[in-house]
């Protein structure tokens, strides 16, 4: 490993700054991680104070706020779609002021709205998480994922992490994931794709070596 990026590990809102400061202390002592993506609830009216505290740590590069919303309660992470929330949109816009990127974790049913938000803020780099998380594996779900990925790929400031395959298919194999991986690279190109481990979460579904 040459360099490492730490993505927020699910810290509660009141612990997010403490997590970032702890990670920065590790980097100061041992060099790792080289970059930090912290957590901030962008729909918090007080989010600017949180962002200002995050960037006090020099290795902070971005923010992740998981906003997966799905009409099926089995899949949804949030009680409502925050891409329809004006307070969230205002919080998102503040990322540019602090020079931060956004790790966007959504489902394909949110991609059209995500496209509109990202297009309105070309100065905020976006990293789409977990291959776009196409959890609906039927024909309609596949078509929605493909069209959403194609739309997001038209924005040059949007990149994608190929990861989280266990979220998509808990019994995944190389053959079952190959089309998703290749289609993602085809749409975004090699310069806007990165492979990410998503460990330890993906350890639930397979080994790191696999």
At which residue positions do the language-model features occur?
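H/E-rich (His + Asp/Glu) clusters that bind or coordinate divalent metals
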Residues: 135-210
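Non-cysteine beta-strand/loop elements that form the S-adenosyl-L-methionine
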Residues: 60-68, 125-131, 158-162, 190-195
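Proline-centered flexible-loop/turn and helix-kink motifs
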Residues: 31, 122-123, 156, 189
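Active-site cradle of extracellular carbohydrate-active enzymes
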Residues: 114-118, 132
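Active-site gating/metal-coordination segments in enzymes
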Residues: 14-109, 116, 159-168, 175
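Alpha-helical scaffolding within the catalytic cores
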Residues: 1, 47-49, 111-112, 140-149
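Active-site metal-binding loops of divalent metal-dependent hydrolases
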Residues: 9, 131, 197-199
